[in-house]
Amino acid sequence: MGSARDDGELGLLVEEARRLLAGDAQGELDLGITAKAVKAEMVGPPAGVLFGDAAAGSAPRQLVARAQVLKSCSGLLYDALAGVYADLGFDDAVDDEVFRDLVIARVVEPTSLLDVDRILAELGRACASLSTRKRTLRRASVGGYRGQIAAACFQTACATGDMSLVLYDVTTLYFEAEKEDDLRKVGYSKERRVDPQIVVGLLVDRRGFPLEIGCFEGNKAETLTIVPIVKAFQQRHEISDMVVVADAGMLSSSNLRDLDEAGLRFIVGSRVTKAPGDLASHFHWHGDFFTDGQVIDTITPRDQRGTATKSSDPKIKAEPVWNPKTHSRSWRAVWAYSTRRAVRDTKMLNLQETKARAVVTGDKSARTPRFVIVRNGARELDEASLQRARHLVGLKGYVTNIDAALMPATEVIASYHDLWRVEQSFRMSKSDLAARPMFARTRDAIEAHLTIVFAALAVSREIQTRTGLSLRRFLRTLKPLRSATIDINGVIATYPPALNTEVEAILNALQPTGSRH
């Protein structure tokens, strides 16, 4: 342990030795011998006189250095994140410590590649050099890291959830760049920007756990992204049967045909403008009267125009039951009515009508909004379109190729409503993980950045699933708990932070299921 010059230093060394002996790393042999308590005097024996012999003189006084903190770090947070990273199988899939540190730094505080060393230093981790970090990004881009991470995510999802249904959605990430290139192009932006952007597609399971991610040109239509992502996922994991759920933006006849020909089942949102054709029989016999929670199971034409085949015969009161053999040119359509949705739709229509009237009267200048038509150079309110929209409030449609015998209409609706999980994952990646690659310019750098975000999203979703806490609250709880390295008169020791019951519960929840206590 060291040497001591007086009884005080000896007491500190004895205490440090006891702490090491009591540690988990120190083994103990059961010899049946009771250890004898050791006593070390912190103060020397008393002298014979009160003030000593003045004639003898006093011994020179030795100054003892004050205890000082050499460093402190959030090592507990790093260990917790590294444990989840390893539990997901990423250490085995990608044997790269620098990549792991980049992923953990992205979870803790999204920042530039240059600033990663500051984040890792706060976590008590020695950071690799900037050139090593850049080489790691190149390896991630050309070394197949994304495929290996995706394979590990798939194994985790299979072990913890149901892989019979996956959810898909897209988003856009913009760049503050003046010029376009082969990847970053100006296109339809969900954030209403005119900057160059990329389109990112994300596939998740029922829990919102990421399974596949893809990057496309900024001007690529959303409908053209779902098939490449789903087919890549299907080929990577050799899946022949699963249900793909997507919103109405993915609804195109070619997409549905390609998914059906690939042997996949789908559930996509339908546009409300198709309701008059799909529900022609209902409107003929019942008008626009619906009851709250009413569900109508019918058919819808496969082509976009709806002219190839009629959806339903208005003269027949009963809705047709979709059969893939007898209705080879139609898909199954499920329509549901909700009073709550009707109230929300009516409120939105009122706002749109007010805006349209303001534009028509010239009180407000704007691009031609909904329900405004231009006739003979003058703007007019489209009363007919507004009236048709009011007849359809409260309706929501779903298109699928799943037979009613396999999945009832209520389950189709419930499966579609799980789409909020992929939207939540996108919000987490764009806000908590700052997925927008502000500092990446080349395609390889952007792809490597998205691979890190993909792995960080998997770690974040797993933390949220295990602890029940949002990522922000998890970080706010563990980050302030810092271990300290203290120098006490030459004796250097590291002391962990004190843990309360809340933190202990979080750490226990992060452990794999078999090792929790």
Where are these regions (language model features)?
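Conserved structural-core and active-site-/substrate-pathway-adjacent residues in large, well-folded domains
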Residues: 116, 167-169, 208, 247, ...
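Secondary-structure transition/capping motifs at alpha-helix termini
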Residues: 123-128, 143, 159-160, 206-209, ...
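Short amphipathic alpha-helical "interface-anchor" segments enriched in bulky aromatics
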Residues: 412-439
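Basic, amphipathic alpha-helical segments enriched in Lys/Arg and hydrophobic/aromatic residues
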Residues: 2-5, 442-464
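Dynamic "connector" segments at or just before major functional cores
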Residues: 1-182, 194, 203-214, 219, ...
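An anionic, glycine-rich sequence signature occurring as long contiguous blocks
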Residues: 196-198, 215, 257, 263-415, ...
